[in-house]
Amino acid sequence: MIARIILTLVLLALLGPADAQQFGPAQFAIKDDDGDPMSNHSLSADQMAQVAGLPGLVDVGGPKGDVTLYQFYDLNCPFCKEAAADVDALIRGDRTLRLVFVPYPVLSAQSIEAARVELALRELSTPQKFLEFHRKIYGGRGLIDGNRALAVAQMLGFDRKKIIETANTKRVTDTMTTHAKIGSALKLVATPAYVVQGAAILGHPGLEPLRTLVASVRKCKAVVC
């Protein structure tokens, strides 16, 4: 498999212990599908530009959509797995939404291994093929590490050697480091985290609240009208 994990401890140290969904003070009146307030805070125009300029982004919705929603996720976050089905339904039902995946491996060394494979696939395939991988790997159970991610990629027809070579490049390491640094700077201390229209939402609110957020951005250019 992947012979070595470069900067694993550095990546984890950048964020410290990360939680797989965490709640705290809310700046905007955003609620989850149970009616409970979601932890969130505002982001400046400069911070939004930092997110938009990240390397290694994967557009899986409409690339020219009228609303852009970023999802920062860790493949081993249980709430991210739960969110995957909702996010899939969201883009299937909204062809003008630009959904952007941001691999954000902050929970473990195994998450970093798997993210290396993901970022290699991003370079070697299309966004739709990446989405197919995303669906497939979340369809299984148990810990997702580099070996499991590689096995799923091979099932989808990717060349093992090319994946490993790409996954271990400095380019991929730099991408993960940048994601970790920006995520930490933006206080994305829970996974999944969503960034949209000047707001960061920590945790997964559910499908209908996400639809409401997107509708609000379309209507009044804000997450809450």
Task: Annotate the PLM regions.
Residues 67, 78-81, 108-112, 124-128, ...:
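Soluble non-cytosolic domains of exported or imported proteins
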Residues 44-45, 72-73, 133-135, 164-166:
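A short, structure-level motif marking secondary-structure boundaries and short turns
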Residues 84-88, 114-118, 130-134, 146, ...:
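Extracytoplasmic/secreted envelope proteins and their assembly/folding machinery
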Residues 93-122, 127-153:
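Structural microenvironment flanking redox-active thiols in thiol-disulfide oxidoreductases
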Residues 17-110, 174-185, 190, 219-225:
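Extracytoplasmic thiol/disulfide redox context detector
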Residues 72-74, 102-105, 137-138, 197, ...:
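Active-site-proximal beta-strand/loop segments in catalytic clefts of secreted hydrolases
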